[in-house]
């Protein structure tokens, strides 16, 4: 199908026996990062265009939903979490250096100068940003019915909120602007129910 003779099997660099691609400095580590940021760039372009256009609320809501989706995945992929491994002092030191950090945020109005010094943001700052995008999208898409299945509806927005709160429920740290622990789990259940209904 499609001229790909390997359509029904893993590519060589994904075989477990060839784990060099899976190392921290291997091919797979930047794969998601690079592709998600390409999608974020496109969402930012759409947001920028919507900001300059009359009647582009739906485009803005769709773009903010997709951007929130990307950052939610990136935050979960690159949030350094403790692993159960044999004693490795270097691992513990490296973990402490990035504990609670996710990925850099690139907004539609981020300048090139800001990009040159754009460090990883805290988990709290990232999820605050994600919820800002989802809340805006929820308002803008309140009366929107997607024309195709690849565009977000309110159910998608509620589902993304449920996923975000479910992730935050696994943390015991207290944040001023986003819930964690049981409070986050309750919100995850609430938004999951909204997505289903």
Task: Describe the function of each predicted region.
Residues 102-110:
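Aromatic- and acidic-residue-enriched carbohydrate-binding clefts of CAZyme catalytic domains
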Residues 1-8, 28, 32, 83-103, ...:
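An aromatic- and glycine-enriched ligand-binding surface/loop that stacks and positions planar moieties
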Residues 142-151, 175-177:
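Short helix/loop segment immediately N-terminal to the Walker
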Residues 55-60, 150, 177, 181-184:
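Residue-level recognition of alpha-helical structural elements
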Residues 6-81, 116-126, 136-147:
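Conserved, well-structured interaction surfaces
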Residues 113:
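Surface-exposed, gly/pro-biased binding rims or lids
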Residues 109, 119-122, 153-156:
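General structural signal for secondary-structure boundaries
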């Amino acid at each position: 199908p499609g001229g790909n003779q390997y359509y029904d099997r893993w590519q060589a660099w994904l075989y477990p026996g060839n784990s060099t691609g899976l190392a921290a400095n291997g091919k797979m580590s930047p794969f998601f990062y690079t592709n998600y940021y390409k999608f974020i760039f496109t969402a930012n372009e759409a947001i920028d265009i919507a900001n300059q256009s009359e009647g582009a609320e739906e485009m803005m809501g769709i773009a903010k939903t997709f951007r929130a989706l990307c950052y939610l995945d990136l935050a979960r992929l690159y949030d350094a979490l403790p692993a159960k491994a044999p004693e490795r002092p270097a691992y513990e030191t490296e973990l402490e250096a990035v504990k609670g950090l996710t990925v850099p945020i690139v907004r539609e109005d981020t300048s090139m100068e800001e990009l040159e010094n754009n460090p990883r943001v805290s988990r709290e700052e990232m999820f605050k940003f994600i919820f800002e995008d989802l809340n805006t999208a929820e308002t803008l898409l309140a009366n929107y019915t997607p024309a195709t299945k690849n565009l977000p509806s309110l159910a998608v927005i509620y589902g993304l909120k449920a996923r975000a709160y479910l992730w935050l429920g696994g943390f015991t740290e207290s944040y001023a602007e986003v819930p964690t622990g049981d409070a986050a789990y309750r919100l995850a259940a609430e938004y999951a129910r909204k997505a289903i209904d």
